[in-house]
Structure formats: C-alpha cells, structure tokens
C-alpha cells in the first residue's frame, strides 16, 4: 500500500513539495520546503533510529504514526553522491564497515528485533532449494554448490556481527561535507563479517591489495578469512543467478553466470 499523498501533505503542511523517491512500492518520498529536504519512508525498521544515532545513515528527524497504523520516518536528505567503484578500496569505506561490524548498539537492536544469527548450513539449504526451484542444473552451478558443500564445515565462525549484506557501491553515500553513509538496511543480518567483506573485496579491491585494505579495516588476512570470504561471495552469486532466473531477467541471469565462471576460476586458482 502506498503512502497517502494527501495525508503527507496534511502532516507536513501545504508549503511542502512532495514527490516520489522512485521504486515500485510507493513507500518512499522526497519533501522539500525553504531549502530543507526530507526523505520520507513508510514502516522503516526501528533499527533505523540506532543507525541514525551511530552516524551510519543520514540523521532521523522524526517518526510519526499514521491513522491506519503505518509509521512514517523522516530523515535529512543529504546532498552528495554515491560512491564510485574505485572509491570502495579507500580507507573511509574500511573504517565505516569496521564501525558497523564492531557496534554493540546495532547488534543489541537486531537481537531485540528477533533476528537470529545466520547459519551457513541453513543458507546453503535455502540456496539449493532456490536453484532446484528454477530447474537450473548447469555444470558450473553444480560445481559451485559442490565447493560450498565441501567447505561448509570450515566456515563456521563464532563472532557474529551486524552485516549489511548488500555493500554495493550504490548503497554508499558521500555528503558534500565529506561524511560517508551506508544506506538501505532492509536486508541486514547477524552473521560472519566475511558475508560483507567477501563481496566487497572480490568486487572492488585487487587481490594484492586485500591485506592492506583489511589492515585499514583492522584485521589480518588469515587463511580462514580467505576461505570464508570465498564461500560467502560464491553463495551470494549463485543466489543471484537463481533469483534472476526466477524473475525472467535474462540479461542479468547471463551476466551473473559469467560472473560465476570468473569467480570459480579465482577461487580454485
């Protein structure tokens, strides 16, 4: 159900201009008035308040409950830009991700919201079901699944943290005053930090630079971490393949298959 534009107008006042923020759900809007700009969203998680307090997302201005029970949140709309792929190898990204992964406040809130730590075995079972559902039996995918099965016992890691689970460069915003934010937290999980580190390093950082990037993040590149990162980026790639196949996104499906081909060569080399 979309946000009621008339209700928003009454909430903010007639002086505010309100327009959709994009996306198919109708759940997000921009509003502006006298140089002030807000980003409005319906039914954001209570997690947003902690992310705002920690300085990880743009500041939460207010939260209001609508007559139908929906909750609208308003955040400062930041003027700035998305990061470019080349920006992802820099220190600011490493330091912000480290801040997220070591935040007790974020972890406590996700636990209060009922999130359970991700189990790699359960993730692999879901992945195999998704592949079976789209009848995708390509030898390359089966090779990838075999790798995940063979190394499952090696990826159990005790220290679970809050993971964003979609660290694509499009989700990192750099404001005009050089403040970095990570947005779009709908898929956040309690998991092995390698779930974020793997996709980020494999997609954005040259392999010879992994050690120096992880040094900025604050840890060493161990063989255990190397394996866990490979495991999670591989599982993510196969999940994307099954998802695009199910949606009938032919171009994205073939692109993901090519990515899997390259990834398997990198992992086994």
UniProtKB/Swiss-Prot annotation:
GO cellular component: cytoplasm
GO biological process terms, semicolon-separated: cell division; DNA damage response; DNA replication initiation
Protein name: Cell cycle regulator CcrZ
Main location: cytoplasm
Outcome recorded upon mutating residue 166 to A: Loss of ATPase activity. Loss of ability to complement for the deletion of this protein
Regulation of this protein's activity per its record: Activated by D-ribose and 2-deoxy-D-ribose. Slightly activated by kanamycin and gentamicin.
One GO MF term attached to the UniProt entry: ATP binding
Class of enzymatic activity (EC top level): transferase
Species name: Bacillus subtilis (strain 168)
Reported impact of residue 21 to V: No effect on susceptibility to DNA damage
General function of this protein: Plays a role in cell cycle regulation and chromosome integrity. Activates DnaA-dependent chromosomal DNA replication initiation ensuring that the chromosome is replicated at the right time during the cell cycle. May regulate replication initiation through phosphorylation of a possible second messenger or metabolite, and by interacting with replication initiation proteins. Has ATPase activity with D-ribose and 2-deoxy-D-ribose in vitro, but not with choline. Involved in DNA damage response.
Gene: ccrZ
InterPro entries, sorted: Aminoglycoside_PTrfase, CcrZ_PhaseVar_Mediator, Kinase-like_dom_sf
Ranges spanned by the short sequence motif Brenner's motif [HXDhX3N], renumbered to the chain: 164-171
Binding positions (ATP): 39, 76-78, 80
